[in-house]
């Protein structure tokens, strides 16, 4: 988040709590009209299958077992979602946000395949395996890139994978949309000064990239100054950013607020 926004979750006023498995509800119940009156975003996986789980004639036992495994995870994910929605229905302080599959798969789906490609030499030593993994991660088929992402996470370890990916994160990373919505729910009102600092940070990156024409940067700098001075509002400067630099990753963030 800090690489993209220039400010961390802590600096936004958001605390990140890592809770395993079913522990969500035990902590989330604290956020209530009669308890802690602050917003809480629950972020977890829906675990939808990346393959067709229908067993057909001719499937080998290995294929059948693989399909059953994916189906089982999917059913647990659907049950998890239903349980969370039922538990906190009517509670305005809590909302749940789900990766369609898992974080690793959705991270690649969001457009971050290159980040995963960058860690392959750290995960595999065999050149043929690296080549196969590269082809799968670059595929548009979720069954291929999803399976490779899951294989890396399961074999290398999710914690170790997170550390490796963390070293590859840069300002051009695409934050998965479900995470952005979770951030926006937890912190729906961002002060103008914070937005100015975020956009100023992104503009400085553009000014230094040796690709973006400086006249375009200078023109947006005028709009940003007008925003700081109250001459245009957040929606106005958001639209100006999208118009001037449509490919900048900050637009992913701006559109959810």
Task: Outline where the language-model segments fall.
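Acidic, divalent-metal-binding catalytic cores of TOPRIM
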Residues: 1-257
């Amino acid at each position: 988040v800090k690489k993209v926004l220039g400010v961390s979750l802590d600096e936004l006023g958001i605390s990140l709590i890592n809770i395993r498995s079913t522990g969500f509800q035990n902590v989330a119940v604290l956020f209530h009209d009669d308890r802690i009156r602050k917003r809480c975003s629950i972020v977890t996986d829906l675990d939808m299958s990346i393959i067709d789980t229908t067993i057909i004639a001719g499937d080998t036992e290995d294929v059948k077992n693989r399909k059953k495994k994916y189906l089982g995870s999917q059913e647990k994910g659907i049950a998890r979602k239903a349980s969370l929605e039922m538990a906190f229905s009517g509670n305005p302080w809590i909302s749940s946000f789900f990766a369609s599959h898992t974080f690793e798969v959705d991270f690649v789906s969001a457009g971050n395949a290159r980040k995963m490609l960058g860690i392959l030499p750290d995960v595999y030593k065999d050149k043929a395996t690296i080549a196969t993994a590269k082809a799968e991660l670059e595929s548009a088929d979720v069954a291929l890139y999803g399976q490779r992402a899951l294989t890396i996470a399961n074999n290398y370890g999710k914690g170790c994978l997170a550390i490796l990916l963390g070293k590859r994160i840069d300002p051009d990373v695409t934050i998965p949309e479900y995470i952005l919505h979770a951030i926006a729910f937890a912190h729906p009102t961002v002060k103008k000064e914070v937005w100015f600092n975020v956009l100023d940070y992104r503009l400085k990156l553009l000014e230094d990239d040796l690709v973006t024409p400086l006249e375009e940067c200078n023109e947006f700098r005028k709009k940003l100054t007008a925003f700081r001075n109250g001459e245009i509002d957040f929606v106005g400067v958001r639209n100006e950013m999208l118009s001037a630099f449509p490919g900048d990753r900050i637009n992913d963030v701006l559109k959810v607020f």
